[in-house]
Amino acid sequence: MTLTLPAPAKLNLFLHITGRRDDGYHQLQTVFALLDHGDTLRFSPADTLSLQCHQEGGASDLPTDDSNLILQAARALQAHTGSSKGAAITLTKRLPMGGGVGGGSSDAATALLGLNAFWALGLTLQELAHIGLTLGADVPVFVFGKSAWAEGVGEKINPIILPNDAFLVVHPGIHVSTARIFGDQQLTRDTPISKLPASLETVLTREFHNDCEAVATQHFPEIGKTLDWLKQHTGNARMTGTGACCFSRLTGLQQGQQLLQQLPQHWTGFVARSCNTSPLHQILGEALAKFRETKNSGKPA
């Protein structure tokens, strides 16, 4: 059986830093919106673990050793279960690295769910999320696969229902280090704790914001230019995560496609819709149902 699964992007519709723990981790509040656009992972039978990476539209400089979160996820799954099974994993990369759209975390989550199915391990989402949290604070939200209001260091996740909005996501061609942003002394770390609003439409209003945005634009003026360009063309703009990607909510997908044609040189972008259930869960469920049907019929998978 060969299994092909998506690793969807996310947006932080807002990001408040509400404190800092004694261990250095930041307390936060955020809303995660999952998108119907992202990377793709393919799992093929093999005796050992291996990873190949392909960058869509260009040559890949992504690591294929254990420094890659995909292989870290696979090794963690093996260690947790005692499994010694292998798989040939192929990553098709579309999401920018250091973009704030969760590319590495989403890849890791897809590796966990994909290999859990591929190796027939039978772990629950809670068990996979626990493993995922050791890889990164954003991994659990991709494991659970729901739009979410998140708190703590990002591990306290409450599923929510968001409008299925269209977004334009723009990457200004720079890489932002999360550690650099969170380590900046000017970063706001005392935003008052908010309550889940009655209307989730309000999370894109001024009451909510991204605390990392001011610091990121100081370090990387291109982010400020991106926000200004988006505001000029759509009337709204916000940075996701610690950057560098910025986004605007659109009136529809067609508006986004038109704006993509107008992007300044060296910028890239994509248009996507938010979805309350991850494409990963939808496609994995369909693949497993098809596999069971094929197995019961006696035909080769």
Curated annotation (Swiss-Prot):
InterPro entries: GHMP_kinase_C_dom (IPR013750), GHMP_kinase_C_sf (IPR036554), GHMP_kinase_N_dom (IPR006204), IspE (IPR004424), Ribosomal_Su5_D2-typ_SF (IPR020568), Ribsml_uS5_D2-typ_fold_subgr (IPR014721)
Reactions catalysed according to its record: 4-CDP-2-C-methyl-D-erythritol + ATP = 4-CDP-2-C-methyl-D-erythritol 2-phosphate + ADP + H(+)
UniProt entry keywords in alphabetical sequence: ATP-binding, Isoprene biosynthesis, Kinase, Nucleotide-binding, Transferase
Residues that hold ATP according to the record: P96, M97, G98, G99, G100, V101, G102, G103, G104, S105, S106
Keyword ATP-binding: yes
GO molecular function: 4-(cytidine 5'-diphospho)-2-C-methyl-D-erythritol kinase activity; ATP binding
Record has tRNA processing as a keyword: no
Active site residues of this protein: K10, D138
Coiled-coil regions, chain positions: none
The protein's Enzyme Commission number: 2.7.1.148
Pathway: Isoprenoid biosynthesis; isopentenyl diphosphate biosynthesis via DXP pathway; isopentenyl diphosphate from 1-deoxy-D-xylulose 5-phosphate: step 3/6
GO BP terms: isopentenyl diphosphate biosynthetic process, methylerythritol 4-phosphate pathway; terpenoid biosynthetic process
Protein function: Catalyzes the phosphorylation of the position 2 hydroxy group of 4-diphosphocytidyl-2C-methyl-D-erythritol.
Family: Belongs to the GHMP kinase family. IspE subfamily.
Name used for this protein in its record: 4-diphosphocytidyl-2-C-methyl-D-erythritol kinase
